[in-house]
């Protein structure tokens, strides 16, 4: 902290109690950051579960589906003599039920069958591999004691104990590697009436892989609560330190938020209507099952793709679905967070983004309606399901809005809040990486502001809250998991995939331009229109240095955010077109800016207007060069769901391409001077020049002047 007024930045002055606030900002900030990092190694309570099944006396099967699919270990023991007396074609033990399609290929089966020579044998098979096939005569040997099967990590063994090894070692087998069978219970064809005497002593023991079924200890819970409170306190003290500029703080939610306009009513009404009748996303089914199974299993397990590993470190959003599933699994109820995100996204656009983009955006209704149209086009096509894209779309828009507010108000707290929102957006899904682009767009102005204020309050008082807020996501990542569990889940994801490199991004665009639900009309059109708007505003910005009628700084940063987001999208491990849903909010803001750019003199030139029309025709043509396909049952009864859209038997794409070619041709003729700069104005002049030849002498301009000046009223 500087001691002299000469060294203190102009306009920043200490206030009474500043030193106390500075000390507490340092203490609470670094304490919150330290406890967030510590959360991953704090102790947890892990439940170890074992399933023990004894065959007799009723031989009742037990259903025990495992969240992880495969156990840590499995042990089967059965006496030899009774085993030799089971009826023919009988399954003695199985880890999958009779009608399971993968009973032999995925499970473990002990059964009596006949071998290739027609002799009766007891066969032990695991995952399509026959470990043992021993004749019944061998089992009747008094030396044979028990069948012992042991499956554990790294090896699978099966043997009939008590028998001497023979040359072929037919009574013992071992298979290295992870050959543990899939287990959904213990099943048998035997009943109390058909089972031989003595077989009731058989046992099956399963140790459940419950490494992820853990809960925080009291120590961990207390420390995490302290860390969260310390983080919130550090933000409060940083807010107090923002007062060194002598200005009063702004309302967090301006009064204008409570006033609804006509466009607000239309957007909210469309979102509500589409919430009830609109199409869902392709992953809603398995995400709903994950949410329903999270309660009994004790954690959010991804059974669908990654062997029941937890949705961590990205996936806190699914915990919200878990809470909702405990109330009801009705589709409108489960998708209520999506609707809330949509409404909040539009309110941010209309109340934060539009005023920030300048005077013309505030006073002219055209940009607001255009932004609403593109926002709804994105939201209805991509964001009406259970996937996390709506949360990330809201997070990206809110991050950029907070950055702009921080720059406009010259306050640190909005910028720090933007860092926290960006972190939680990244924690909702890999596409949340786009929020880094929003932070990077305003980084220069924010760092300049931090350096200026650090000369008065010190660096530690600012960095402490920044670190605490940025690392607060770790409290959700390690709420009931350990660092080891999260690293294991990450390893499983990387090994099993899909985990595509950055240069695999072409697959996303190939899917978008493919004829499928991934590249349907509804998905392709908003993405291409967003790209067209991006090219338009970038061209005007490069030509004029700014967009007339729009604020220069926010306009440049918005362009940078969207361009950077498209760049960061290549680093996501999966390449699905539904990821484009994260652009819903930013695309709406870009549409507002694009309409303002159309009024500039750069685009007002006749040649450039025709080029814009040609680009729009190209977007329509490319968007309709596919089926109007939606996912699953949402495709029932949809027009053109199995054909390209057409009017009167003529495909729209051809009409659009022809129109685009005509517009491009006119622009070329104007550029070369063959046509005048404004063909419409030139045509009107030609018509006016021809009018005297069509009028009577009494109706000429000269006669009208003469008659008007005579004063004759007869």
What are these regions, as identified by a protein language model?
Residues 402-406, 434-467:
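Perimembrane helix-loop-helix junctions
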Residues 336-364, 370-371:
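Transmembrane-helix motifs of polytopic, lipid-linked glycan transferases
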Residues 364-406, 410, 414-440:
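Membrane-embedded helix bundles of polyisoprenyl
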Residues 2-43, 210-274, 354:
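Start-transfer (signal-anchor) and selected internal transmembrane alpha helices
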Residues 292, 306-341, 425, 432:
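Short hydrophobic/aromatic helix or loop-helix immediately within or flanking a transmembrane segment
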Residues 200-212, 314-328, 494-522, 636-650:
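Juxtamembrane membrane-water interface segments that cap and precede transmembrane helices
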Residues 526-549, 663-671:
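Hydrophobic, aromatic-rich transmembrane alpha-helices
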Residues 607-714:
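Transmembrane helical bundles and short interhelical boundary loops of multi-pass, membrane-embedded
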